[in-house]
């Protein structure tokens, strides 16, 4: 959230010298923690998912999928693009920055429904019976799954659209949470 809510907004207002200094000295350090924080979260998430065993249901399956996409966005899109932006590697910073922004905003978008999936896994309306019990062909699971996949594709090659602002991405995350888990619960 730091990059979306704090650093990005600061860079919009910063003097050129201050922005250049932060890009050179602060951003690489913050990106290191961001990247390895994503790795730790991913690995602990897999471990906790494995520990749930028979406690897995549609909610946590969708939340886990979004968590996996968030991890992949950090390591395969955001980090490589940001290395170019901050000058660690050669490349077109003007082309790399929008890629990082789209993936980063997609991660914020997925944060709300992913968190809801974690809560819903124990407090949702579905019985738990492990991955074998998830009705992957159920329309109430399939539509949210396809929506998540479409949003991830948009995060890779699309446009930020209403997620261009911090306020917009927060509102979109709340809306996505309501839509996904409304579909899971009522279809």
Residue ranges and their predicted role:
Residues 1-187:
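Polytopic transmembrane helical bundles with strong interfacial aromatic enrichment
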């Amino acid at each position: 959230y730091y990059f979306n809510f704090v650093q990005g907004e600061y860079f919009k207002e910063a003097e050129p010298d201050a922005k250049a200094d932060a890009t050179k000295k602060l951003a690489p350090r913050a990106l290191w923690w961001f990247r390895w924080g994503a790795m730790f979260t991913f690995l602990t998430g897999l471990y906790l998912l494995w520990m749930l065993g028979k406690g897995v249901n549609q909610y946590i399956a969708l939340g886990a999928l979004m968590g996996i996409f968030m991890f992949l966005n950090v390591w395969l899109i955001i980090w490589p693009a940001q290395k170019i932006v901050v000058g660690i590697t050669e490349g077109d910073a003007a082309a790399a920055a929008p890629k990082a922004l789209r993936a980063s905003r997609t991660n914020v978008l997925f944060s709300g429904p992913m968190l809801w999936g974690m809560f819903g896994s124990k407090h949702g309306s579905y019985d738990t019976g492990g991955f074998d019990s998830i009705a992957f062909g159920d329309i109430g699971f399939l539509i949210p799954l396809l929506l998540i996949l479409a949003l991830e594709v948009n995060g890779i090659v699309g446009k930020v659209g209403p997620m261009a602002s911090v306020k917009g991405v927060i509102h979109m995350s709340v809306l996505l949470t309501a839509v996904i888990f409304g579909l899971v619960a009522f279809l």
